[in-house]
């Protein structure tokens, strides 16, 4: 009887710990579930474009993580901090402003462009919910996200 209670309690602990980490059968075994999406932290550094491509190759419809709420970001921060500690990781946000149509204050279209090569990709801190502009070619850690497969 004691052994049965131990095993039952052990299974309950495993079940509760898995539900707390977001494990769900709709995600691949090493991905975590949250609100209809699957997430995976990658402990390797890549440029923004290489990380985005890598996420696309990992799972159909995969991409660098995006956030739709502070709760979602908190979930990702809880996953990343133990791995990356006080570092930054790529997020899917990218500033595509260079592709917009700009006009000078005198009404003339901007045909000549002399933009500096300042960063136009974004990273997230692992310590709080802040994003920073970062050089896209700088290798960083990253998190992939995908919709739950039906």
From Swiss-Prot:
GO terms for cellular component: extracellular region. Heterodimer; disulfide-linked. Pfam families: Lectin_C. It is found in: Secreted. Gene3D superfamilies: Mannose-Binding Protein A, subunit A. It comes from Daboia siamensis (Eastern Russel's viper). Belongs to the snaclec family. One of its GO terms (molecular function) is toxin activity. InterPro entries: C-type_lectin-like, C-type_lectin-like/link_sf, C-type_lectin/snaclec_domain, C-type_lectin_CS, CTDL_fold. Residues 34-145 form the C-type lectin domain. Disulfide bonds join 27-38, 55-144, 121-136. It comes from the Eukaryota. PANTHER family: MANNOSE, PHOSPHOLIPASE, LECTIN RECEPTOR RELATED (PTHR22803). Residues 1-23 form the signal peptide. This is Snaclec 7.
């Amino acid at each position: 009887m004691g052994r049965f209670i131990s095993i039952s309690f052990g299974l309950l602990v495993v079940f509760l710990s898995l539900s707390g980490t977001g494990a769900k059968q709709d995600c691949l075994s090493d991905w975590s579930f949250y609100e209809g999406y699957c997430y995976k932290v990658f402990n390797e550094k890549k440029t923004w474009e290489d990380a985005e491509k890598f996420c696309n190759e990992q799972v159909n419809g995969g991409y660098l993580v995006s956030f739709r709420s502070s709760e979602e970001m908190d979930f990702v921060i809880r996953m990343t901090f133990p791995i990356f500690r006080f570092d930054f990781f790529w997020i899917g946000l990218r500033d595509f402003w260079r592709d917009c149509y700009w006009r000078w204050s005198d009404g003339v279209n901007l045909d000549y462009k002399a933009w500096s090569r300042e960063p136009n990709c974004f990273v997230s801190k692992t310590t709080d919910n802040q994003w920073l502009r970062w050089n896209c070619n700088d290798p960083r850690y990253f998190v992939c996200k995908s919709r739950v497969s039906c």
